[in-house]
């Protein structure tokens, strides 16, 4: 009888070890998958940040003077490579070229007139998780005339950005999707600056 109990106990012990090993192996696979996903996410964020830094290096020139002072097509291609799409538009003999780069979820659009940058735009970019400093109360406290630099210093760089220069007026429209306190994933704050001074602002679902 003792022999039967011993065999049974040994069998249960082996079964327990086997189940533990399976559980450990399953947990190990799950952890490995999570680590792989996080690594891929970190690489994407890193690549997007590098793209954003290159975007920031593009100089926008005066539209009324054929992009004077702006980066050339060659300058931009050195930073971003060859575009995915190009388009040329002519209005009253005034020619503009649109170059578009698609990098994952991020789209960079640069307009040349005819060979120097007159506008630049980046959409789909997000800085990733950061402190939610920009809530509805903070948004409402931002006054017309506040400088772009002051807003960035307080709330961080915007995610999307559009910049142009016309008749000496530099216009920047900046959107924040991260670093904000929102009701849902679609929440955002949009601020427009002229010559570094806030002229208008809108928000969607901040709280």
State where each predicted segment sits.
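Positively charged n-region of N-terminal signal peptides that target proteins for export
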Residues: 1-4
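N-terminal, intrinsically disordered, polar/charged segments of Gram-positive cell-envelope systems
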Residues: 6-10, 15-16, 21-79
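Short, composition-biased local secondary-structure segments
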Residues: 40-47, 109-121
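Residue-level marker of intrinsically disordered, low-complexity segments enriched
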Residues: 43, 56-58, 104, 120, ...
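Short, recurring structural edge motifs at helix starts
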Residues: 58-66, 136-140, 178-179
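A cross-family detector of function-defining hotspots
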Residues: 71-115, 146-207
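Long, charged/polar, surface-exposed segments that mediate recognition or autoinhibition
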Residues: 116-159
């Amino acid at each position: 009888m003792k022999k039967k109990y011993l065999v049974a106990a040994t069998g249960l012990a082996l079964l327990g070890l086997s189940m533990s090993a399976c559980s450990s192996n399953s947990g190990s696979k799950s952890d490995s998958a999570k680590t792989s996903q996080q690594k891929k996410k970190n690489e994407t964020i890193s690549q997007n940040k590098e793209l954003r830094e290159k975007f920031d290096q593009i100089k926008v020139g005066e539209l009324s003077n054929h992009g004077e002072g702006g980066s050339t097509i060659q300058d931009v291609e050195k930073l971003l490579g060859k575009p995915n799409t190009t388009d040329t538009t002519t209005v009253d003999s005034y020619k503009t070229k649109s170059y578009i780069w698609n990098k994952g979820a991020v789209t960079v659009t640069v307009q040349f007139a005819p060979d120097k940058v007159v506008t630049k735009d980046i959409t789909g970019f997000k800085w990733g998780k950061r402190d939610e400093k920009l809530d509805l109360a903070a948004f409402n406290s931002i006054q017309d005339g506040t400088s772009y630099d002051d807003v960035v210093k307080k709330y961080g760089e915007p995610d999307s950005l559009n910049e142009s220069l016309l008749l000496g007026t530099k216009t920047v429209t900046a959107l924040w999707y991260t670093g904000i306190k929102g009701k849902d994933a679609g929440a955002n704050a949009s601020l427009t600056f002229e010559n570094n001074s806030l002229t208008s602002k809108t928000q969607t679902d901040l709280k």
